[in-house]
Each structure stands twice: as C-alpha cells, then as structure tokens.
Amino acid sequence: MNPHNVKYLAKILCLKAEIQKNPYAVISKDVVHRYSTDIRYGDLTTIISVRHKTSTSNTVFQVFNESSVNYTPVDNDYGYPIIITSFLQTGHNKFPISFLYIDVVASDVFPKFARLSPTDVATVYSVLQIGDTKDALKLPRMLETEISAKILFHKDFPLKIVRFFKNNMVTGEEISDRSLVAVLE
C-alpha cells in the first residue's frame, strides 16, 4: 500500500459512501465530484474521510493491509475495515492491490451501474418467465468479486441484479442487467 494506491482507493470509497447514503443511486465516475476526501496515510493503517460536498455527511474508512488488520470502529465509521489484499477475494471490503495500480474510476471504461429496486427486480423476473411454465430465461451472470458488486454492497439491501447503462449514439441509453453469483471458496 502506498500513497498513490490509497488515493485511487479513496475514489472507490466515495462511490461506496454514495451507496451508503442512497442504496439505489446510479454510480458513475461523475459521482466522485460530489465528494471531498481527507487521507491520513500510514504504513499499517490509513484513515480516509469521505465528505459529501453539499450535505456534509461524513464517512470514515479505515484501510489496512491484509496482514495487519487491527480494526476498532471510530466516529462516523463505515462499519467494516477496508482490506488491501494480494489477490482477488470475496468480500465487499477486500480490494486486491491490482485494482489500485491505476485510477480505475477515472478510466473511460468505468461502467455506469445501479442496484435495482425490489419492484424492478420483480419486473425483470416476470419478463424472464416463459409463458405459464416454471421455466425462465437466465440473465448473464457476474461474480461478487467484481468491483461494481463491491461498490454496491449495502448491509440492509441484498444485491441480486446489477443494471449497467451504456450510451449508444443511435438508440440513446441502453441497459443490460446481470445477476450476481456468489463465489464459492
């Protein structure tokens, strides 16, 4: 973990703070501009404070290397330690160092995505139903280890389907839904 990795991680944590504030928010790289960050870098523990610019809500994230997790909640704490790992692992709070080599959020390929509301989930499942039979079409799947699933985690709202938005010059905005699949360890 170095200061550059932590700066890139702070942008991802801004997106997680937006989901804590509004679980059904549409996440894109523009969301980062709504937040300011205060990073207190340390070799073993880094404290990242994420403050919303207009509502002044503050969320504090404690970041640890996977070998030295010493977590105790503080004021305005996120509720979970953020752990930098060597490899891709399950868990919404575990980010592999490979995610942090570049500024993923600022990338042109960073997706625009959102969690579906319960009524939207029911609508999607009803559309996938084949007639009156018990058979149903399946959505494309995504692993819970993908960064979009890690960002969309909220303890009170389980994530079932992620909706991705893609701009199309001809048809406007296209949507594609993907169902979340748990990774077996």
From Swiss-Prot:
Recorded superkingdom = Viruses
Q: Please provide the record's keywords in A-Z order.
A: DNA-directed RNA polymerase, Nucleotidyltransferase, Transcription, Transferase, Virion
* Subcellular location(s) per record: Virion
Which Gene Ontology BP terms does the record give?
viral transcription
GO MF, one annotated term:
DNA binding
Q: What is its EC number?
A: 2.7.7.6
Q: Which GO terms describe its cellular component?
A: DNA-directed RNA polymerase complex; virion component
The top EC class is: transferase
The entry's family comment says: Belongs to the poxviridae DNA-directed RNA polymerase 22 kDa subunit family.
Name it. DNA-directed RNA polymerase 21 kDa subunit
